[in-house]
């Protein structure tokens, strides 16, 4: 319902029970729906393990008003364009999508673009040109992840849908993103030593002779920072924590390896 004020901002008893079950099962991510602010994120954070991530679904105008605090508090956001369009209007969604992707990049947080990306493939074995362009646009804008829902869950052609999306992603990523400097220069910096080291090598990351950036990470923090820069080289993350390895696989350009033999006593994260 457009412009509806949602009054709840606390986890229900069932929510807490579901979260505890997810923790017990070893889930890597918890997704939160219909957020209005960061309160549910902070409450959820107290109930999950340190190496579990939170995905915050952006679905209403209230979340947009508080988006900075939401992005700072969460690990990833999902742009749920269907419900968002109902609340703010379809014509507003494209510019909001671009704005959210840029904001997430500034704070080194991953962003998922979702809803009806290949909707026609629920019933048909080929996509429309508009759908292909929609996927490509999200990639050009800098999205970490593009997502299928009903196309893969209940559609008649799930394999073809995944294949179509994969081909579109690979084809689009070959094209040089001239706006990449915007991402490279927009990362918010502070006195964090990891960020300082990262910024010192950012130009090298765009050197065509550099084939890969190897990130050794206990927490996934360095992988997020490197991914946010959208380097030309592939990013290989090595972590002793299998949950971290799975989480960083959501990030743009990251290939993760779980290595139980690797430990880092000197520093939490580093890269080369």
Please name every model-derived segment.
Residues 262-272:
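Single conserved hydrophobic/aromatic residue that forms the stacking wall/gate
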Residues 1-264:
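Non-catalytic helical/linker scaffolds that mediate oligomerization, partner binding
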